[in-house]
Amino acid sequence: MAAKSQIVTGDYADEYIRFLQLQLGGDRNFCYICVDVKSGMAAVVDPGFRAGWLSAAAAERGLKISCILITHGHSDHVAQAGRLADITGAPVYAGERERVPGSLVLTDGQRLNLGTRPITAFHTPGHSPGHLCYLFENRLMTGDLLFCGKVGGTGPGFPGSAEEEEWASLKRIASLPEETLVYPGHDYYGGDGRMPHSTIGCEKRNNPFLLCGSFEAFTHLKQNWDSYKREHGIR
């Protein structure tokens, strides 16, 4: 079923939940489908440009898309959210400071009930002003705040971004239990599927940005990231 640009890179299921990680092309974008097994209700996180494919993929698995969750308003994450809403009748949710047409606002700490299972939104600004992360059971979908071994961009190329806010947001999610699974918005580890997810503990031990001991060290690393990557063989 999946074309080269539409690949299921993770499919976890137990008696309570199902969780799918999908690579949907674009800039190695990840999309997620969170499922309450009991009700068959599903939430799609960051549909990107693949509304039709996602709708068909859910239908083939007997799932009903009941909500569409947006981490932030950049087009590679949100372009066809409205179309997916039209196809499924599901509402779109995003942060208050994001420009996502037709979306309902989620606030920090707000919970949505997906059948019998909650999804919690965390306001994590930095890469964008209204950026949200979503926690489903022990799975944290971090959008473009935190990647495997890297963090989201800030600066002139990202309007509304703020390094100080990103630093605070990273410190906040780093306080979650170390076994919390991290599912990023892009496959920037290597682009080859070798590490499509991580844990909070792994990132705290290995991510050079989370190893920074101060905001000043964090900004210095950001400013010198290209040379750091060359020195350490990071792609």
Where are these regions (language model features)?
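Conserved beta-strand hairpin/beta-sheet module of binuclear metal-dependent hydrolase folds
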Residues: 7-61, 133-143, 149
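Metallo-beta-lactamase
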Residues: 129-231
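Hydrophobic residues at beta-strand termini and immediately following loops
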Residues: 22, 106, 124, 200
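Active-site HxH/HxHxD metal-binding segment of metal-dependent hydrolases
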Residues: 28, 39-42, 47-120, 205-209
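Core dinuclear metal-dependent hydrolase active-site scaffold
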Residues: 33, 111-136, 175
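Histidine-centered catalytic micro-motifs
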Residues: 68-78, 122-130, 183-189
